[in-house]
Design a protein with these regions (language model features):
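Core beta-strand elements of the Rossmann-like FAD/NAD(P) dinucleotide-binding domain
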Residues: 41-43, 194-204, 283-285
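N-terminal Rossmann-like FAD-binding beta1-loop-alpha1 element of flavoenzymes
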Residues: 43-71, 475-480
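Short hydrophobic core segments
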Residues: 46-48, 72, 175, 199-215, ...
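Glycine-rich FAD pyrophosphate-binding loop
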Residues: 62-87
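Residue-level recognition of phosphate/Mg2+-coordinating polar/acidic sites
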Residues: 77, 98, 107, 122-142, ...
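Short beta-strand to alpha-helix junction loop
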Residues: 111-119, 141-160, 214-219, 246-250, ...
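A conserved short coil-to-beta-strand element within the FAD-binding core of flavoproteins
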Residues: 171-188
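Glycine-rich loop(s) and the adjacent beta-strand/alpha-helix scaffold that form part
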Residues: 204-251
Length: 487
């Protein structure tokens, strides 16, 4: 593992528009206005960050007996990243999930235990019955969406649920640091160092400040700074994840806008290193999109971390802006390779297609039967096959080269588009330094972690929301327990 150094120490279903509609039994309650002010209180839970994980943690802390729960949000609005999710439709959950759907450099067993604390079905019931969302399954993708297709509804209802539980939300409240102090009664508390106001004292802290992806919404990595500097945690070095990659298109062509379902896999670094012994990672039959800068789509995003992590940690390319290494840097980085089979068909299937009669048919026509025309033409150019070449005239050496291009094309990655385009941040506070039963820091008791600040992220498809809901719930319940017992 790479570390940045720290100091040592349902109800009935109805069929509608191709989805299974789950009818919520939650009561509809009116909106509650946000409380803008809060005061220092050594019996309070301070939640740093009003994203999906932070609001979930606040809800469960209040629901499980915490006397006072205050959410500190540095911007003027809660849940900004929720509003951007799923093209503003907000894919709140996958239909099912496995540990293999997530990426962590920590011990996988820790992640497995955390995820086992709340399964997808129970999480769905909470979203419907307690938060008040009506969800449906999009069968093509196996994802849960709100029937309203509105990410704003998800944010608003989550915030309203918190307010109903008595949670206070303070906007423009930027916490810059933490310091352990005495609570005046022989116990410990935490002092919050505020940017524009006096320090405040609280009993426990839930750190849910997110990562560095989409900095426009206010995520700037402050949570990592606090975890390392004030809480003495190591960090798995952060890097942009679920991020578009940059590079040249096949055949020197420009193919922006071309989309195709592919079978994509990552071949690990060769040479017998520990990283090189890892199994191939796959993203089967998923969308691949050519962009003006290179490559995107679920297939690319899900495996981008395999390449980006190496680039960042070899050349320090973890900047917010677009990052493009030179060809020499890429070679020096000894990157894993992303290998694509266009259309997902096997080499044997393509070989049979190219050999099938009549011999006077054009090779280009055979490719266009299974691929978008612009991509088919670009792959012919990449293989050096003329677009007027007939099947009967295709030489063996050219056929073999074309088969390689069709079924094991190595994507020429030059770099990535940085945190500005990354959906999440990889790396973060290691799970090995967190109590997996409570999400409490093993280095600084009284501080809990949840969400993207942890060394966990999921693939495209609602898995990052599942991590936010699950880790937020566990942190919130755990943070409330000692306070509710002492009241």
């Amino acid at each position: 593992m790479f570390y940045v150094g720290a100091r040592m120490r349902v109800p009935s279903q109805m069929r509608a528009f191709g989805v299974d509609r789950k009818v919520s039994t939650a009561s509809r309650k009116p909106k509650v206005s946000v409380r803008a002010q809060g005061t220092s209180d050594t019996t309070s839970v301070a939640v740093l960050g009003a994203g999906a994980a932070g609001l979930t943690a606040a809800y469960f802390a209040a629901a499980h007996g915490a006397k006072r729960v205050v959410v500190y949000e540095r911007t003027s609005e809660a849940g900004k990243k929720i509003l951007m999710s799923g093209g503003a439709r907000c894919n709140v959950l996958p239909v099912s999930a496995r540990v293999e759907d997530f990426v962590t450099e920590s011990t996988p067993r820790k992640l497995k235990n955390i995820m086992a604390s709340w399964n997808v079905e129970r999480c769905r019931e909470w979203l419907e019955n307690d938060i008040g969302l009506e969800l449906g399954i999009e069968h093509v993708t196996n994802k849960y969406f709100p029937l309203s297709n509105s990410s704003r509804e998800v944010r608003d209802k989550l915030l309203e649920a918190c307010l109903r539980e008595g949670v206070e939300v303070r906007y423009g409240a930027s916490v810059e640091g933490l310091r352990p102090v005495s609570d005046g009664a022989g116990g410990e508390a935490w002092s919050l160092r505020m940017r524009d106001s006096p320090d405040e004292q609280v009993s426990v802290v839930i750190l849910a400040m997110g990562g560095m992806s989409f900095p426009a919404v206010g995520t700037d990595g402050t949570g990592y700074v606090i975890a390392r500097r004030d809480l003495e945690h190591n960090l798995a070095e952060p890097y942009p994840a679920l991020v578009p990659l940059t590079g040249k298109h096949p055949g020197g062509e420009q193919l922006p806008g071309v989309s195709v379902n592919v079978s994509l896999q990552c071949e690990p670094i060769s040479g017998g290193t520990k990283a090189g012994k890892k199994k191939k990672a796959k993203a089967n039959r998923e969308g691949f999109l050519f962009t003006h800068r290179g490559f995107s789509g679920p297939a690319i995003l899900d495996l981008s971390h395999e390449v980006v992590r190496t680039l960042v940690r070899t050349k320090g390319g973890s900047k917010r802006e677009d990052v493009e290494q030179s060809a020499a840097d890429v070679v020096e980085a000894a990157m894993p390779s992303l290998v694509v089979s266009w259309s997902g068909e096997s080499r044997v299937e393509w070989q049979e297609r190219l050999a099938a009669p009549p011999g006077k048919a054009l090779v280009a026509t055979r490719l266009r039967d299974g691929l978008p025309q612009r991509l088919a033409d670009a792959l012919l150019a990449e293989a050096g096959v003329d677009d007027d070449c007939k099947v009967a005239d295709l030489r063996k050496v050219d056929r073999l080269k074309l088969l390689d291009v069709l079924t094991k094309y190595r994507i020429p990655v030059k770099g990535h588009q940085g945190y500005r385009k990354a959906e999440v941040t990889g790396g973060g506070v290691p799970l090995d330094e967190i109590n997996f039963q409570t999400m409490e820091s093993l280095k600084s008791p009284g501080v809990y972690f949840c969400g993207e600040v942890c060394d966990v992220f999921g693939r495209i498809g609602g898995f990052n929301f599942l991590w936010a809901w699950t880790s937020g719930r566990l942190a919130g319940m755990s943070a409330a327990k000692p306070l509710s017992e002492n009241q």
